[in-house]
Regions:
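ATP-dependent carboxylate activation and anion-phosphoryl transfer catalytic cores
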Residues: 2-17, 22-26, 46, 292-384
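Hydrophobic beta-strand scaffold residues
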Residues: 51, 142-143, 171, 201, ...
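ATP-grasp fold ATP-binding core
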Residues: 164-165, 193-212, 235-244, 248
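ATP-binding N-terminal substructure of ATP-dependent carboxylate-amine bond-forming enzymes
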Residues: 1-149, 153-159, 163-166, 177-188, ...
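Phosphate-binding site of ATP-dependent enzymes
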Residues: 215-303, 324-331
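A glycine- and small-aliphatic-rich helix-loop capping segment at beta-alpha/alpha-beta transitions
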Residues: 134-143, 219, 224, 353-356
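Glycine-rich phosphate-binding loop of ATP-grasp-fold ATP-dependent ligases
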Residues: 33, 171-176, 200-228, 247-249
Length: 384
């Protein structure tokens, strides 16, 4: 680990690029973030990059991890955790510092740890939603992934779907229910759902991923319980029509000229592609890579993935999820601006099937982040 000396700036032994992997977070996807970070840390080129790991606890505190390979030493995804023994740090919003302030035991800034680039491996609110991206913009630190706007609309499924719909991109029908209205007029909300849809429907928090808080409602009597489950995670909930069909995913990479990978297919063995199926049950789903699609449908998936990516102002990376109905309609379900990066995650596996290894993918993401950062740096911010 880089030596920390109060009152001074830490020195690095080499001219390597200092990359901070930021992981954990306050959301319900904390452990998933750690699993993704573990794979990224292992694959980063240590000959070119000095890897710094900062973990955000569920309480929101940031800790520099004394051993950047600490996550690698944990094998059980159910119990993976951060090392709380490292010093607390905060990211300075001062653009002259562009780094981490290391705090002493009295929570007083002790020293500065400058950063060249941050990889926010944060899934869900307080990380994937534009909040951390905004802080990094203030700090003038390059970072991987979408900017503030793309991250925010990519997190909020309501805003995302309205933008896609307005752009003419086909999506499943949906409606939004707010907690304040549900608490006053639950029956009226239920009536509105069943006037619009027939069972089954999916009920999901508007601002969460990894299938957390999502329920498949097969009967009308199950709706209240599903709504209460979703409201535990968000004050805004989506009710979406149930689509019978195949689940197709496509990875997108790039800034101004994004490119799409070969599509893949998820064949869940659970009722749907749940949190357990994604991360805890090794037999939870089969991944078909590449998906068994016609050439025409493959090209349609790739074109629509890029169109959705551009519509939602994404940069760097994104994974677009689709439904392919039995009558051949292709519908965009959502986009993930910080997709899963575990060794079994679809995003890196699709690029691997398209000829880009995990390590090469990380190198390309770093290049794209530096490209975006340089472009923003050159923008004028005052009248002259």
């Amino acid at each position: 680990m880089t030596n920390v000396i109060c009152g001074g700036k830490p020195e690095t032994a080499t001219n390597k690029r200092r990359v901070c992997v930021l992981c954990g977070g306050r959301s319900g996807e904390h452990e998933i973030s750690l699993l993704s970070a573990r794979a990224i840390i292992e694959a980063l080129d240590r000959a070119r990059n000095e890897v710094i790991v900062v973990g955000i606890g569920k309480d929101g505190q940031w800790h520099l991890q004394p051993d950047p390979d600490y996550l690698q030493k944990q094998s059980d995804p159910r119990t993976i955790h951060l090392d709380p023994s490292g010093p607390r740090v905060v990211l300075s919003a001062d653009p002259e510092m562009h780094g981490l302030l290391i705090l002493d035991d009295n929570a007083t800034a002790c020293s500065l740890l400058p950063l060249d680039l941050v990889f926010p491996v944060l899934h869900g609110p307080y990380g994937e939603d534009g909040t951390v991206q905004g802080l990094l913009e203030l700090s003038r630190i390059a970072y991987i992934g979408a900017g503030v706007l793309g991250s925010a609309v990519g997190m909020d499924k309501d805003a995302m779907k309205r933008l896609l719909r307005d752009a003419g991109i086909p999506i499943p029908d949906f409606l939004v229910v707010y907690q304040r209205k549900w608490s006053r007029e639950a029956q009226k909300c239920q009536d509105a759902v069943w006037e619009r849809f027939a069972p089954p429907v999916f009920v999901k928090p508007a601002n969460l991923g990894s299938s957390l808080g999502i329920s498949k409602v097969k009967t009308k009597s199950d709706l209240p319980r599903a709504m209460e489950t979703a409201f535990q995670y968000d004050t805004k909930v989506l009710v979406e029509e149930g689509i019978e069909g195949r689940e197709i995913e496509c990875s997108v990479l790039g800034n101004d000229e994004p490119v799409a990978s070969a599509p893949g297919e998820i064949v869940p063995r659970h009722e749907f592609y749940s949190y357990e199926a994604k991360y805890l049950d090794e037999q939870g789903a089969a991944l078909e890579i590449p998906a068994k699609l016609s050439e025409e449908m493959t090209e349609q998936v790739r074109q629509l993935a890029v169109a959705a990516y551009r519509t939602l102002c994404c940069e760097g990376m994104g994974r677009v999820d689709f439904f392919l109905t039995r009558d051949g309609r292709l519908l965009v379900g959502e986009i993930n601006t910080i997709p899963g990066f575990t060794k079994i995650s679809m995003y890196p596996k699709l690029w691997e099937a398209s000829g880009l290894s995990f390590a090469e993918l990380l190198d390309r993401l770093i290049e794209l982040a530096l490209e975006c950062h340089e472009r923003r740096r050159r923008l004028k911010i005052e009248h002259s």
